[in-house]
């Protein structure tokens, strides 16, 4: 609830939706480069490269923030882009795909990483490949949405209006 008014004020919901998808795509690409790849010596001494681990955690934090922001924008966007009689139908579709994405992220991607690890005997490599697959999927969705999601006239930033004041933000909160 606290972040939502800022999303409304700063840019359009379409812009937030696509930009957050781009940010998540970039984060997943960077994750393929930062997943710790300790040397045999580090493995033997049971130490890890903390700087790469820290960067990996930072990228996951950015991804979580982008995902939450995307959710806020997408919730508002479909209400602007669809006629009222189609909104209930879309809620069902969106909920279904949200659940499928959870299963894919928590099940299929983990199974892919596990299968790669079994064949390669390299855990970091298996996760780098899995993050790359995720980055490709997110990038494809972002590219598609950039060109094909509608541009409703009612999707406007409220920056510069009375709704953009700090008082209005806290009143809404």
Which ranges hold each PLM region?
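Helix-to-loop junctions at the C-terminal end of transmembrane segments
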Residues: 1-12, 113
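Cytoplasmic membrane-interface "Motif A"-like loop-to-helix N-cap segments
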Residues: 8-25
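Helix-to-coil boundary motifs at intracellular loop junctions of multi-pass secondary transporters
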Residues: 9-10, 77-82, 115
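Helix-breaking motifs and short loop linkers at transmembrane-helix boundaries and internal kinks
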Residues: 11, 34-35
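Intracellular loop-helix junctions on the cytosolic face of multi-pass helical membrane proteins
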Residues: 25, 35, 40-57, 69, ...
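Helical-face signature of the major facilitator-like transporter fold
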Residues: 59-64
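Intracellular juxtamembrane helix-capping segments at the cytosolic ends
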Residues: 65-82
